[in-house]
C-alpha cells in the first residue's frame, strides 16, 4: 500500500513547463498524469528510462519500450555508466546501452495507465507528448538473510516511485519522429 502519492509537479507547474519547453499555452484540462508508487525495480535504470522517454509521444515511447522488452532496441545509459560494457557504437552513437526489461515492463504499465487517463480527460492520444518523467527513490524494505553460525546479514530492497506527466499539444508542435538527444547532463 503506498504511503503517500505526491507528484513533484502541480498542474500549474506542469502548464508552465509545457510553455517553457514547447512555447505553447495549454490548460490544466489538457494534462494527464500517472503515478506508480513503490515499484520493486532498479532506481538507476528507472532514471535512465524516464530520462529517455521524456519528449516522446505516447505512441513512440510505448513502441520503443516494447522493443526493449523484445530485446530489439536498447536504452542509452548516460549517468550510471561506470564499469559498464562500452560497445562499438552500433546504436546511434551511444557506447553504453542496456536492455532493462523489468523496468520497461513497469513503464509500459504506467504508460497504459497514462493513456487511459488521457482518454478519460478527452485528450487526443495521438497528440499527447510526455513532458515530464521522473523516478524517485521510495522506501527500503528491510529483510534479514540468515547466515552460518547464528549470524545474519541485512538485506534491503529498494523501491522506486515513478511519475509521468503528459500534455496534449497542437499538431505542429508534436514531434513527428523522435530524434535521440545525446547531450550529456
Swiss-Prot record:
Q: Which GO terms describe its molecular function?
A: rRNA binding; structural constituent of ribosome
Pfam families hit by this protein: Ribosomal_L22 (PF00237)
Gene Ontology biological process: cytoplasmic translation
Instruction: State any GO CC term.
Output: cytosolic large ribosomal subunit
* Name this polypeptide is given: Large ribosomal subunit protein uL22
Q: Which domain of life is it from?
A: Archaea
Task: Alphabetically list the UniProt keywords.
Answer: Ribonucleoprotein, Ribosomal protein, RNA-binding, rRNA-binding
Is Ribosomal protein found in the keyword set? Answer: yes
